[in-house]
C-alpha cells in the first residue's frame, strides 16, 4: 500500500468541547467569479480527504475540491469525530446525530472564518443523513442542500437488507475493521463496471492511510433507527442525487421523501451509470456538472 499525502489546501483544527476535529480547505480560484462556499460531508467508511480530495493518475479532477475551487467555490470538508485525523478516543460509536453536532461546530467556524452568510451543503450516504439533520437543526446556515446516495426509511434498500444481517455485530462494538477488500466491495455490490480498478485502488490507498477501522454508529442508525429525519422540517432548496444502480435506497423511498420537502425550489436527479460513491465512478464529471448547476442556479424571480 502507498501512503497518501495531501497538498494544495489548508489544515484547520477546531474544538467541539474537548474534542479536536480536523478540517481541510481549498480556496476558490481568484481567476473566476466567486460562486459560494461548499461544505462536503463524508460517509460511513472513509474520511473526508480520500472522498473529496482524491488524486488518481490520468483521471483529471478526481478531487472534487479541486474542480469546484477552480470553478469559483471556496471548498471545505471535515473528518467527523471517530474518522481520519479527528479525535477517536471516546468510548462511543459516533452516530449520525454526533456527526451532525460536528457539522454545527464546523459550519460556524467556516462562517466566522470566511465571512460567508450561508453554506452550500453536500453529503453522501450517511454523510447525507448528517447534512440533512444538521440542516433541520440550523436552516439559517444553509443556502442549498445536496443529498447524494441518501436513504430515508430504508424501505427497498438492498444494501441495508444485507447489512442488517450483521447488526448484532455492529451493536457489540464501537468500531469495525476495514481493509482493501472491503473498499473494493463497495464498488462490487451494486454494478461493478461503474468504476475502474486504478481509481478504486487509489481510493483504498487514501482511506487506509488514515484508518484501519471505522465507527459502527452510522451503520447501527441506518440498519435499526431510520427514519432519522422529517422532510417537512428541511426548508431550504434541496436536490436528491440517486445513482442509477445504487442499492442504498429504494427509488420509492426517495420519491416519498422528495414529495414532502416544502421548498418548491427542489430537484431530483437520477445519475445514469452510477452506483454508490459517485465521485469515484467513471461518470464522476456528470455529478460535478449536476451539482454545479444546482449550486449556481439563480433564485426564482417569481415565487407565487
Task: Specify the residue positions occupied by each region the protein language model found.
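N-terminal cap/lid segment of alpha/beta-hydrolase-fold proteins
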Residues: 1-32
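Short, surface-exposed "cap/lid" segments of acyl-processing enzymes
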Residues: 30-73
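Glycine-rich "HGGG/HGxG" loop immediately N-terminal to the catalytic nucleophile
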Residues: 49-50, 76-94, 276
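Conserved acidic catalytic loop of the alpha/beta-hydrolase fold
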Residues: 100-118
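Conserved hydrolase catalytic core segment
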Residues: 117-122, 126-153
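Alpha/beta-hydrolase
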Residues: 160-241
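Conserved alpha/beta-hydrolase "acid-adjacent" motif
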Residues: 247-253
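Catalytic histidine-centered segment of alpha/beta-hydrolase-like enzymes
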Residues: 274-285
